[in-house]
């Protein structure tokens, strides 16, 4: 059968966040490439829920990596600021951003020569329409 229907579905929140950040910061979705540049942000969806068929609420982790702790912290704070601005301007599917927790990991577990700061944020996004 080739019946076409229009559905409402979740957005790819990792990509939405990356797109919101790309003009201002170097941002990657999982997996982090082997040759990543710093400072950068790694975006990982770690949970979420559906609210009344209109919006999704996503739990997202932002991991900032840089050559020193001050730059990692600055990169993380800038990323959160850019996402809040995107939500306020409504230039993406992102409608609201709230920080649940943030802090320093000390050194990056993958590359101990780098410092790492992380935040777990909650992102509210509109559903998208798709024909299938």
Residue map of PLM features:
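A short, hydrophobic beta-strand-centered structural micro-motif
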Residues: 37-45
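Short, well-structured beta-strand/strand-turn elements
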Residues: 27-31
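A short beta-turn/loop motif at secondary-structure boundaries
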Residues: 32-36
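Charged, amphipathic alpha-helical segments and their flanking helix caps
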Residues: 1-25, 44-132
């Amino acid at each position: 059968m080739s019946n076409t229907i229009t559905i409402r579905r979740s957005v790819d929140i990792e990509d939405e966040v990356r797109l919101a950040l790309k003009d201002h910061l170097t941002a990657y979705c999982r997996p982090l490439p082997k040759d990543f540049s710093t400072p950068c942000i790694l975006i990982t969806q770690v949970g979420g829920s559906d609210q009344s068929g209109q919006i999704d609420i996503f739990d997202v982790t932002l991991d900032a990596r840089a050559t020193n702790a001050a730059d990692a912290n600055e990169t993380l704070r800038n990323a959160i600021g850019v996402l809040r601005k995107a939500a306020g301007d409504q230039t993406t599917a992102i409608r609201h951003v709230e920080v649940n927790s943030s802090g320093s990991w000390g050194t990056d577990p993958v590359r101990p020569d780098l410092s790492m700061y992380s935040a777990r944020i909650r992102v509210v996004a509109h559903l998208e329409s798709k024909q299938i």
